């Protein structure tokens, strides 16, 4: 018997933002981004929409920056200290999912940035979610070359989800 597991995307929208954010919208954006990046179909991902205070606390605790930010990504896969990788045909339990991590987005920050950029809050939320998911998939922007690669993937993903935004 072959078991197929579908991507599981868990979403928490904190109470002040429940009427402002569609969990279904976030799920579609994350799902399309993961598919476009050929992520493991058994992947799991968590998304949290929160406020400025909570994201500021997390930013301070984990990045030592005492200020709010728009999005934080928490990578959950453990780094392998011996740099070992299992062969492609290595057996894994059929129901064992790969938990990529958590993407935390500040709704108020997204709202501010959307206003400054002249587009909708949903457009900004989609961009931030794509950005966060790409971080979980290993993309980064600390060096110029890596930043160009990540920006290219963000642009492709934004074009891919254009229909969802309309």
Swiss-Prot record:
PROSITE patterns: UPF0054. GO terms for cellular component: cytoplasm. InterPro entries: MetalPrtase_cat_dom_sf_prd (IPR023091), YbeY (IPR002036), YbeY_CS (IPR020549). Zn(2+) binds at residues 131, 135, 141. GO terms for molecular function: metalloendopeptidase activity; RNA endonuclease activity; zinc ion binding. It is found in: Cytoplasm. One of its GO terms (biological process) is rRNA processing. The keyword Hydrolase applies. Binds 1 zinc ion. It comes from the Bacteria. Its EC number is 3.1.-.-. It holds the Pfam family YbeY. NCBIfam families: rRNA maturation RNase YbeY. Single strand-specific metallo-endoribonuclease involved in late-stage 70S ribosome quality control and in maturation of the 3' terminus of the 16S rRNA. This is Endoribonuclease YbeY. The gene is ybeY.
């Amino acid at each position: 018997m072959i078991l197929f597991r579908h991507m599981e995307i868990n979403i928490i929208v904190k109470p002040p933002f429940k009427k402002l954010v569609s969990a279904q919208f976030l799920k579609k954006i994350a799902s399309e981004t993961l598919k476009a990046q050929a992520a493991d179909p058994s992947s799991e991902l968590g998304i949290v929409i929160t406020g400025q205070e909570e994201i500021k606390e997390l930013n301070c605790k984990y990045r030592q920056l005492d200020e709010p930010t728009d999005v934080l990504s928490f990578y959950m896969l453990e780094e392998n200290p011996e740099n070992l990788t299992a062969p492609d045909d290595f057996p894994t339990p059929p129901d064992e999912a790969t938990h990529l991590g958590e993407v935390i987005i500040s709704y108020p920050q997204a709202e501010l940035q959307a206003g400054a950029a002249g587009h909708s809050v949903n457009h900004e939320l989609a961009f931030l979610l794509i950005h966060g998911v790409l971080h979980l998939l290993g993309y980064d922007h600390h060096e110029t070359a890596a930043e160009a690669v990540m920006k290219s993937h963000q642009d492709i993903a934004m074009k891919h989800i254009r229909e969802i935004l309309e």
